[in-house]
Structures are given as C-alpha cells and as structure tokens.
C-alpha cells in the first residue's frame, strides 16, 4: 500500500513498491496569501453558486433561505424555498441555476415532510435585487428518501446540460444497490425531471451503491467525479461511470472485486468527511468537514497522491467552487451543530489557487 501523504490518504493502484512516494506537501507550501471574507455571519450554509454578473447565491440549511451576494459585496435575502423541513442533517441543500431562453430557473434540493426532493422556481429581478417566484415552484424529482442523516443533497448541471442529483442512503443501506430505490444513487434527469436520454437503466438512476454523495464536478474531458462519505473506515473520491455500482454497503474503500468499482482515492473520516468538490484546471478540490481541510487531487497525474491545504485554518468546510482571477471560494460550516463557530462564522472565503 502507498505511503500516507498529509494524513491517511490512499491512492488507487499504488501497491507497487517500485513507485516512488512523492514528498509530503504541507499547507504552508501550497497556500498563498490571506483569505478574503466575501460574506460573514452565515447560518449553516450548504451550497454556493456563482452567477454571471459576479455575484453568488448561498443556501442556508436550517431556515431554507437563499441569500444573494452581490458583485459589490452586499449580502441580502433573495427568498425562502417553500416547504423546507429541517432536522439533523436535512434541510435546504444544493443549488443550481439554469438559463433557458428568457427564463432563469433556480433549482434546489431540500428535505420535505416525507422525502427529499428537487424543486425549481423562476429566479426573478436584476442583480442586487434577485428574488424567488415561490408561487411558481415546480417539483422536479420527489420520493428521494429522507432521514436525519445520509441525505446527500448536491445538484449540478453537467456538460450535457442534464441535471445530476447526489442522494444518500438515508439509513437504508441495504437498498443502496437497488435500482428501484432513489437513495444511495447519483441521478441524471432532464431539466424537467424526466430520465435523461441515454441513462443506463432507462430510469432516473445513473450510478448506484453509494452511501452519501455530497460532491459532483467534471473534468475537462467530461468525466464526472464524486465525493462520498464512508462509515467508519474510508471516505472516497470516485470516478463515475454510467451504470457503475460502487459497492456500498458491501464494500467501503478498495474492494478489488468484480462486483464493484473501486474509488480513485480514500481517506479516513477524521481527515476528510468530504462534502462539496470543484474541478479547477483538472485538479479536484475536496472540501472536508471533520478533516477541516481541502484535499487536492490532480487528475492529469494520477500517480501523485492527493495533498492537503489549509488544514485546521477555517474549521469545517462544506463547499468549494472556482472563483475569478486564479482564486477559489470556500464555504465554511461551523454553525451546523458540529463545529466550533468563530466570531464571524460562517464565512464565504476567497483564496488564491495553491501552487504546485
């Protein structure tokens, strides 16, 4: 097995003693400049989405609020997603925006009374005064199992303009590999919520055998990557294949069997507990909750193990996205009931891209 780098991370295919171990990379070697706080005082934020005008939208889990961060740095409430039921890890989760003709839609994944669901509603107004037309809410996908934990919740439009939805097993681990169960899956749907053309099982399901996926992003070649919470042993970074079975609950981490696809890299939960991910220059950035760090994995040089930056500097990290001008944005998550909030938490931070 490969030597551990910056913690207990293991890379797929690194069992040969002939492969040299790269030098450990410390956060001080790769992180540049001081962070810029773009927003402070956030309450259990979960997702951040940049807008074309330079602003952003931020979801707050427990209250269902969608906040607008304007390009000039002002923070205001755009609206509240109706029907959000919060409790435990459930509430308002991922956001995505789609423009079609003259319509601009906000998509949101949230907990409801009896399930998790994805809804959409028109995003109205101009930058600086955006609003949610909650009277025109449409259900895109419902019937996703909901529980106090393992709710998944990340949504993103792929290069094919289809909507990808990350779900958790909602504690029903025995059904994560069941194609007829929406939990423990990555779903792929049209913007209206129908099975996307070319789906492997002629259903909403794109991949299965997941425990709790919370990160989705694509490299430049169109490959989908996903982060996944493990149980007690291994968290995972997976390269997603259409129809792929990733083995949960029968396998966690590297199974090396014919009935499941192994992850590309794994971490112990105390060093990762991965949530949102981003791809910047074909490097995957993984936000760690318990790990309180960012993990980076260069998909163009798979023989090099992931390395960590900003370890312990900002507390729990929930989401990460590309920023402007060689920067990236990180959303902290210290007010979710499991962190130790600082005076300005939670925050949206802008950081300079690491070197090397």
Locate predicted features.
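Sec-dependent N-terminal signal peptides
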Residues: 1-8
């Amino acid at each position: 097995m490969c030597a551990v780098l910056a913690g207990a991370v293991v890379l797929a295919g690194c069992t040969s003693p002939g492969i040299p171990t790269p030098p450990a990379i410390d956060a001080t070697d790769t992180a540049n400049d001081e962070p810029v706080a773009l927003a402070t005082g956030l309450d259990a934020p979960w997702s951040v989405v940049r807008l074309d005008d330079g602003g952003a939208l931020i979801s707050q889990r427990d209250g269902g609020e969608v906040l607008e961060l304007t390009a000039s740095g002002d923070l205001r409430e755009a609206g509240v997603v109706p029907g959000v039921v919060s409790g435990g890890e459930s509430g308002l989760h991922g956001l995505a925006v789609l423009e079609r003709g003259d319509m601009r839609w906000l998509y949101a994944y949230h907990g409801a009374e009896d399930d998790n669901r994805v809804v959409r509603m028109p995003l109205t107004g101009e930058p600086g005064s955006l609003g949610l037309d909650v009277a025109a809410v449409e259900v895109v996908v419902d019937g996703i199992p909901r529980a106090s934990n393992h709710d998944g919740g990340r949504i993103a439009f792929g290069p094919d303009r289809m909507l990808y939805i990350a779900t958790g097993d909602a504690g029903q681990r025995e059904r994560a590999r069941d194609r007829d169960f929406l939990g423990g899956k990555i779903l792929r749907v049209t913007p209206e919520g129908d099975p996307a053309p070319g789906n492997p099982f002629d259903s909403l399901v794109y991949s299965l055998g997941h425990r709790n996926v919370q990160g989705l992003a694509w490299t430049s070649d169109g490959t989908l990557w996903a982060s996944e919470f493990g149980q007690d042993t291994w968290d995972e970074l997976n390269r997603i294949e259409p129809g792929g079975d990733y083995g949960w609950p029968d396998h966690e981490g590297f199974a090396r069997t014919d009935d499941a696809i192994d992850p590309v890299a794994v971490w112990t939960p105390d060093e990762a507990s991965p949530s949102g991910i981003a791809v910047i220059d074909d490097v995957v950035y993984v936000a760690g909750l318990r790990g309180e760090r960012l993990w980076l994995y260069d998909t163009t040089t798979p023989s090099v193990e992931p390395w960590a930056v900003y370890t312990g500097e900002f507390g729990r990290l929930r989401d990460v996205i590309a920023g402007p001008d060689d920067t990236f944005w990180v959303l902290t998550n210290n007010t979710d009931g499991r962190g130790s909030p600082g005076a300005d938490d939670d925050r949206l931070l802008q950081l300079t891209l690491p070197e090397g």
